[in-house]
Amino acid sequence: TLPIYAELVREIGGGEVEVSAIANPNEDAHFVRPKPSFARDIRSADAFVTTGLDLELWVPTLLDRAGNGDVIEGARGYITAYTGIALLDVPVSADRSGGDVHIYGNPHLTTDPLRTLQIARNITTGLKRVAPDRAAVFDAGLADFTERLYNRLFGARLVELIGGETLEQLSHGGTLFTFLEANEYEGNPLIKELGGWLARAEPFRGQDIICYHKNWAYFEDRFDVSCADYVEAKPGISPTPGHVAQLINRMKTENLDVMLAATYFDRGKVETVARRGEATLVQVPLSPGAREGIDDYFTLVETWVTELAAAFRNQ
């Protein structure tokens, strides 16, 4: 469904796969309009990767039109991204009056590198199910992706000392920084060995920001930054003038000086709120290919961390 899933398939499958994405890189996945060409692509597919929640509500219609029994829900070629992932923002009730409420939880999983790693594992499992004779290729692709992601997130030195899997478990458990501060290596706290994105995120760690839409929950969770308020008071519904006025007042009085938004939102509208609230705007893509030079998941996360850190350093 999404370009970011297509990129993960390429990472894992390499030359053994041909992959295309339905949504374009700078398109809001909620609002993709099914086209006949999409159904034709699915009709000839061996596998179909989707979030598996209620982000791509247009998927059932496409699968029905395609009529490919190998990739319908429950078939061996149907691969869900969310499997094994702890979901955030699970609503108490499924009342749509609150806007675009996702009844199963927040589906914007790929803003967290470690949850994205789990998606890569799920894709690998699915590809091996479809093409077991190429399992070794897929396992090797996943191993390479995993090593690079660990090194980019934690820093190669810390991965060498502690091990990527252990660091992943500590981070998921919310105890990574406590562990690194409490333990030493050669007389120095292990926290000094932290590198990668987590080290470079230090300028915004523990900080509050303004977000346009609730698509950064998993980024918040991994990098310890908090969306204190949203331009969209109700997800997926354009903000009212009254809400925008209240938000701008809050931004000024509470010194909420940085706003984070995806590039598929109208830049003029986002810039207006940021300017009136006297905030630095960080508007970044959510998918590889949405901006020149962002060609894979690693350069995508690099962009998020670099631009958000720069916004705080410039305050």
Regions found by a protein language model. Name each.
Residues 1-315:
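Extracytoplasmic metal-acquisition and chelation regions
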